[in-house]
Amino acid sequence: MTSEVQVEVAMPIYFSDSAANKVKGLIAEEENPNMKLRVYVTGGGCSGFSYGFTFAETANEDDTKIENAGVTLLVDPMSLQYLVGGTVDYTNGLEGSRFFVNNPNATATCGCGSSFSM
């Protein structure tokens, strides 16, 4: 007799419904179901690190993949260490619309919110 053990693993980074729905809409506009949103961290910006977003058609072998609403968020291993516990989100307000990261690991952010320090 064999038994299965199911273990719930916490997601290393969260992909909000609003971000996933925006990506879903952009995929529909481009008519390219292979598109995935990639979030990454680079050195730079006024606080030391900057977030970046781009679209990719393929995932790298070592990417972390998070799915929501039928779309995929990709994070490379180097960036993931800075984003653990964070949330990729999307806002559309008076200041414009944009993807952003709510990062609990950031000790400081710049005024525009696109760079951070740890």
Curated annotation (Swiss-Prot):
Entry's Gene Ontology molecular function annotations: 2 iron, 2 sulfur cluster binding; 4 iron, 4 sulfur cluster binding; iron ion binding
Classification via Pfam families: Fe-S_biosyn
Matches recorded under InterPro entries: FeS_biogenesis (IPR000361), FeS_cluster_insertion (IPR016092), FeS_cluster_insertion_CS (IPR017870), FeS_cluster_insertion_RrpA (IPR023063), HesB-like_dom_sf (IPR035903)
One BP term from GO: iron-sulfur cluster assembly
Domain of life of the source: Bacteria
Cofactor binding note: Binds 1 iron-sulfur cluster per subunit.
Keywords: Iron, Iron-sulfur, Metal-binding
Cellular-component GO terms for this entry: cytosol
Chain positions recorded as iron-sulfur cluster binding sites: 46, 110, 112
Co-factor(s): iron-sulfur cluster
Summary of the function given for this chain in its UniProt record: Required for insertion of 4Fe-4S clusters for at least IspG.
Assembly, per entry: Homodimer.
Membership in a protein family: Belongs to the HesB/IscA family.
Protein name according to UniProt: Iron-sulfur cluster insertion protein ErpA
Species for this entry: Psychromonas ingrahamii (strain DSM 17664 / CCUG 51855 / 37)
Source organism phylogeny: Bacteria, Pseudomonadati, Pseudomonadota, Gammaproteobacteria, Alteromonadales
